[in-house]
């Protein structure tokens, strides 16, 4: 398990084309940021995507007027994001797989932080380091929206628990060939504990299933730094 970060980094070093913003991102914008808080991008709020991939979510927010920044461990994905948004190419950075709670991204002081399907690639210990890092990058009153794998996620059916919150997922189908480490959250109560640095506003979830492969349940946390 000691080299789990390298195993996961190898997984992300492959090509994963994801050009479109996901529904759980644009609905978060419309139903929470805009509806609840009147945040629509017109104020050019500073937004960080921790685990931005190829920048699909940031392209959506950039088009709305947000001042967007993204970090990821996958250099190939950061290169795609920079080529996709050359006007903010300097707003993307490759980071080390090992979280550093003292690291400040692009001067910090962010109004909004999102981290979708990223933090669940970390052990409990490294998750805590990453959350402290994000907390330190946010201003008082800023918002965070993040997801974690749910306990019912079908990947866990193909996994062995190895400690510190991590499950070693290994399986191969006609579509997938997985050898990686993931963290799964039992319920909303555990989700709240993991994000206890923030005041919780909404603890929720999203799920989908295709080809009858199984549930891909993820819990979501939306909260505020006080």
Question: What residues fall within each predicted segment?
Answer:
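Class I (Rossmann-like) S-adenosyl-L-methionine-dependent methyltransferase catalytic domain
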Residues: 1-44, 53-102, 145-226
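Conserved beta-strand/loop positions that form the S-adenosyl-L-methionine
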Residues: 50
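A conserved beta-strand element that flanks and buttresses the S-adenosyl-L-methionine
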Residues: 114
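Short catalytic micro-motifs in class I SAM-dependent methyltransferases
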Residues: 117-118
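Helix-capping/helix-break motifs at membrane-protein junctions
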Residues: 123-124
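A short glycine-rich, Lys/Arg-flanked "PGG" loop and its adjoining helix->strand segment in the class I
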Residues: 128-140
